[in-house]
């Protein structure tokens, strides 16, 4: 296949910087991402951000079927060339973030994995779309900005620990499985990236995840405020009653959200929701 840069130029493609378009061209890196995702010939894969189709092709070489979602229709002539000859790839020019679960399931089915080089500006929203909503993949492998990846896997009481860390932990286990230098992209972005894999499973069966997510967002609503004050501002429970609940769980009344574990937040959510 011709060089991606030449294909883009010959098709008159102009990068839309508002969409965070940075494409991977190194075949070894592309194959490594697919390997780390654990995709095999039995898997249906959803890719977000087809881009120039380089990762799409690498996934298609291993997967049973690839549904790749792209919002920039200007890439169609590029993809007609880069994905030619592949009969197990379907490019869908739609925004996954705006699609209802029913519409998505009708296209991709209910058993799938997500593999993507995600545009940085939608990273958190996209990951949570596949965790919080009713369509759950068995695994999510994404290339994200390094500092975002660090937040995904952070430990309690660290600078990077936050609502997204807890929210991901509610649905599965995240780990950084690779690092990618910014020079591996075209055009070259300003920051390095990390490859994160989230293995999704019913980690907290029986837990009301909607209520727990409310408590998580509340705990980190204003990081400089104490957990007690944040909870009091959101839940219809008197401050002294909330304080008693925290004390019953051996949580310091001056504690902030970033010092708590997910298990503690689940306990708080359960008691405040009664």
Where are these regions (language model features)?
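Catalytic cores of RNA-modifying enzymes
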Residues: 1-218, 258, 274
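Peripheral terminal appendages
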Residues: 3, 38-44, 54-55, 235, ...
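Hydrophobic "lid"/C-terminal helical patch
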Residues: 33, 231, 269
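An accessory alpha-helical subdomain
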Residues: 194, 198-200, 205-244, 249-252, ...
């Amino acid at each position: 296949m011709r060089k991606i840069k030449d294909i883009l130029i010959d098709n008159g493609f102009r990068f839309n910087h508002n969409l965070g378009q940075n494409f991977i061209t190194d075949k070894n890196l592309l194959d490594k991402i697919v390997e780390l995702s654990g995709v095999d010939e039995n898997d249906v894969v959803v890719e977000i951000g087809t881009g120039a189709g380089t990762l799409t092709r690498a996934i298609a070489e291993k997967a049973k079927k690839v549904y790749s979602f792209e919002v920039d229709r200007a890439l169609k002539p590029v993809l007609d060339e880069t994905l030619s000859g592949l009969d197990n790839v379907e490019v869908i020019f739609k925004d996954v973030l705006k699609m209802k679960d029913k519409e998505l399931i009708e296209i991709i089915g209910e058993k799938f994995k997500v593999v993507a080089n995600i545009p940085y500006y939608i990273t958190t929203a996209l990951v949570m779309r596949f965790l919080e909503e009713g369509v759950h993949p068995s695994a999510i492998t994404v290339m994200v900005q390094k500092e975002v990846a660090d937040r995904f896997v952070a430990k309690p009481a660290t600078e990077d620990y936050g609502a997204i860390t807890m929210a991901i932990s509610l649905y599965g286990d995240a780990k950084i499985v690779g690092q990618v230098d910014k020079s591996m992209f075209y055009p070259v972005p300003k920051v390095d990236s990390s490859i994160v894999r989230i293995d999704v499973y019913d980690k907290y069966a029986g837990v009301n995840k909607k209520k727990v997510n409310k408590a998580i967002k509340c705990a980190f609503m204003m990081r400089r405020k104490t957990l007690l004050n944040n909870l009091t501002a959101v839940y219809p429970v008197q401050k002294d009653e909330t304080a008693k609940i925290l004390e019953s769980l051996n949580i310091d009344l001056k504690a902030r959200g970033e010092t708590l574990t997910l298990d503690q937040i689940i306990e708080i959510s359960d008691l405040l929701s009664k």
